[in-house]
Amino acid sequence: MSGRNQTSTGHEASEAGWLDLHFESSRPEYEAALLDAGIRPGWRVLDAGCGSGGFLPLIASAVGSSGFIAALDLAPENIDRVEALAGTLPEPPEVATHVGSILSLPFADASFDCVWSGNVMQYLTPAEFELAVGEARRVLKPGGILAVKDFDSTILQILPMDRALLARFMAARLQGFRDRGVLGTDCGSTLPARLRQAGLEVVSRKGWLVERWAPAPRFTRDYVRDLLAYFASVAPGYALPDADQAYWRELKQRPDRLLDDPDFCYREFFVMAVCRI
């Protein structure tokens, strides 16, 4: 796994192994969100920005063997993973994979009952977000739904890490997103407003808290260990106090000191907004 968990497209925090750990750590909440999207048997669903395919089995279960799934991602290596995963699904629907961009979908108008997009919008600029929403609206059938999920990392907590220290790190990190012009990992709570501004009717919006106390499950420990290593790798590029930089260097060497603490707690928050066309 690369130091910044990049795909071949250069997107950070989106390498397949990283995505898999994060998905398994948050599985109950992710499953609840997908069920809440309202996907029905027999539907044609586009997984727009499918990553390594974590949501594919859940979508397949929702649409059943009479349904159809198109899985699209920019990274060819992610599509390779999805193709292998599709072959293991029990009583699978038809699954078609595509290397491509959500900004220019390779599908005909009114092709899908649902477009699902999880943890993708954070990588887009506001203009690209509007373009992606326009493309989703184009390929949806009348009455179809667009379900968009993303994080609000302003609520990220990793206890017993000093909250002020993490707040300084996250402020620098979020400013980096602003400087690059992308929505960033705090965009989740802004999704309903952005979708309305793009001319869509938001029919539901809901947030989920992912909370894991010590002793944390294995997937959570592995994910947070990787997350801490990632944060430590980017911290030198931020204007943080010397004491903060020293903390991140030490934590990179000894992450289990935090993970093994009896008061360890990891919290993250995400929001899903559902629109009807």
Task: Annotate the PLM regions.
Residues S2-R27:
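Class I SAM-dependent methyltransferase Rossmann-like catalytic core
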Residues E24-W43, L58:
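Conserved alpha-helix/loop element of class I SAM-dependent methyltransferases that forms part
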Residues L46-A48, S52-S104:
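Class I SAM-dependent methyltransferase SAM/SAH-binding core
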Residues L103-V115:
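A short acidic, Gly/Pro-enriched loop at the edge of an enzyme's catalytic core
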Residues D113-E128:
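A short SAM/SAH-binding and catalytic strip from SAM-dependent methyltransferases
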Residues E130-I145:
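A short glycine-rich, Lys/Arg-flanked "PGG" loop and its adjoining helix->strand segment in the class I
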Residues A147-A216:
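Conserved catalytic/acceptor-binding region of the Class I
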Residues S189-T190, V203-I277:
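Conserved Class I S-adenosyl-L-methionine
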